[in-house]
């Protein structure tokens, strides 16, 4: 989740209540939902932020939380006009916006750090579109 206004180029991180690691909003697809609908819902539920999803950036992170269990998590590039957050206390113990160039040390897992690098590269490669208010003109 990116907040891109003027000089502010920030990424939203959440601290997961069950594990204490810093990462991104995520969750399970509900019956009848698309991946995009799931992403928008989970971001809103966990952070109180309304997201605009950019489907040009879609990354799948595969990991194994325990033996014989493999999970795929789909991430999209998302932006928001909302800077105020509110955390879903049962799942999220803290939320913070971080400057894009300072976020990597705060991200807990290697896979997530790689995801951040890819998302930042995507943003930099499309910066002019974002600066020209791409989403409000499409």
Question: Where is each model-derived feature located?
Answer:
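Phenylalanine-focused residue identity feature
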Residues: 2, 24, 57, 76-77, ...
